[in-house]
Amino acid sequence: MAARKSGSDIHNNGPVSYLDDVPFKLNEKFRCPSKVGLPIGFCLSDCNAILSDLQYDFNLERRTVQWGEELAKARAAEARAAEAIRTDSESERQAASQDAEVGLVGGKKARPSDEQDIVPPALKPVLAGLSHNAILTPLPAPSFGQTRPAPSNPAPQYLNLADFEREEDPFDKLELKTLDDKEELRTILQSQPQSSVSPPQLPPAEHRPVSPSTTPPLQAKTGIFHKPNGLVGLLDLDRGGVLGGQIDADRPCNIRSLTFPKLSDPGDSPLETPLSVYPVAPPRNLSNGTPPSLQRTASNNNTTLPQEQPVFAQNGTPKQSNPVTVTSHPPAGTTLLSLSPSERQCVETIVGMGYSYEGVLKAMQRQGQNVEQVLEYLFTHSRLCDRGFDATAVEECLEMYQGSEEKALEFLQLMSRFGEMGFERDTIKEVLLVHNNDQDKALEDLMTRATAS
């Protein structure tokens, strides 16, 4: 800061300072500090003489290089120590694995558990290795000799949870195990009501005891109907019991025929018997040697069954019909004998699953002898019947729409809906076929026809 003072300024305006030739006035109380002088006798030494006499020895640089060399040596020593530790651990691991192998083979004492290698959890229960899945092994096939009575108190079967940790699927043979278990099948049969198995009306003459002389031929014939999938004939279950005397011994176990009546229709009586339960005749010998399951006559099989087909009145509302006497006609021997061996095997396979001979034969007439197609047709037929539709109408719709469940269900629902409105069944069917199940167009056509008539 340049400060210039002039006498005139001091006299007139007081002390004035200048900054870059710009005057400004300071406060009157401001006083400039006094000058500081050097102490007496103070003098600066000659630096050039001092520097010329100084000799630099490079001690700092030498110390720095020494520190770097020591650090490199320390790092190399640490690397050698780590390599030695890794080598020792690998050698110990190899020795431990060899000791474990020798201990398992030669019977040496095993090492403590903390020194052993960790075994995967799934292999711990089966270290010894099981040869087979013993818990789900199928039972042996029924023998052709004299059957021995089953013990009243069978030995309990214990569940081995280790079998479920193996790689193979424990449920592969579950179906065979279930179907071959005679005790379970006997429990199922004995738990069913007697009215669902035996017909309510049978002539007294048909309840003839089976003589011992006729038993061996029937036992010899069971091999003909032995199924590779493990189905068990009722002959091997309980020959001397009440059910054994009323059920055909050569007929495979029909689980579906032992179910309770359908509960889908609230108007059905609880005493009604499902149509899948066919009246059976006691086992008897035939002169031509044909198994009784292939030759069944309908002369003595008349029984009283309710008619399940709904009958529509003039106003279209369904009414409950009274039970009528119908005659069940199992397929004659000539019908099955006229089939080819492949067709007969297809029939026996599907019948063994619980379906009736009549239903299987009808399905085969429409679908051929492909088991998958026949089963698909039967499944569709069963689902539609479970919805409460008439079996005959279901078969007609499936044949009309080539097995399409969606179109058949739509047709049956519209038939039922228009029938409740009071239209004629034949007219409804004709209109639905013309308009391809179009509800609005079909209803308009029905109203037009009703108005015209």
UniProtKB/Swiss-Prot annotation:
Residues covered by the UMA domain: 19-65
SUPFAM superfamilies: UBA-like
Comment text on domains: The UMA domain mediates association with the ESCRT-I complex.
Disruption phenotype: Impaired motor neuron outgrowth, leading to decreased mobility and shorter lifespan. Axon lengths is significantly shorter in motor neurons.
UniProt protein name: Ubiquitin-associated protein 1
Species whose genome carries this gene: Danio rerio
Keywords of this entry: Cytoplasm, Endosome, Protein transport, Repeat, Transport
Encoding gene (name): ubap1
GO biological process, one term: axon extension
Cited Pfam families: UBA_9, UBAP-1_UBA2
Highest taxon in the source lineage: Eukaryota
Alphabetized CDD domains for the sequence: UBA1_UBAP1, UBA2_UBAP1_like
Protein task: Component of the ESCRT-I complex, a regulator of vesicular trafficking process. Binds to ubiquitinated cargo proteins and is required for the sorting of endocytic ubiquitinated cargos into multivesicular bodies (MVBs).
Sample GO molecular function, one term: ubiquitin binding
Biased composition (Low complexity): 189-199
Subunit structure: Component of an ESCRT-I complex (endosomal sorting complex required for transport I).
Segments for region (Disordered): 83-119, 189-223, 260-335
Comp. bias intervals (Basic and acidic residues): 83-93
PROSITE patterns membership: UBA (PS50030), UMA (PS51497)
InterPro entries linked to this entry: UBA, UBA-like_sf, UBAP-1-like_UBA2, UBAP1, UBAP1_C, UMA
Gene Ontology CC entries for this record: cytosol; ESCRT I complex
UBA domain span: 340-381, 403-449
Subcellular compartments: Cytoplasm, Cytosol; Endosome
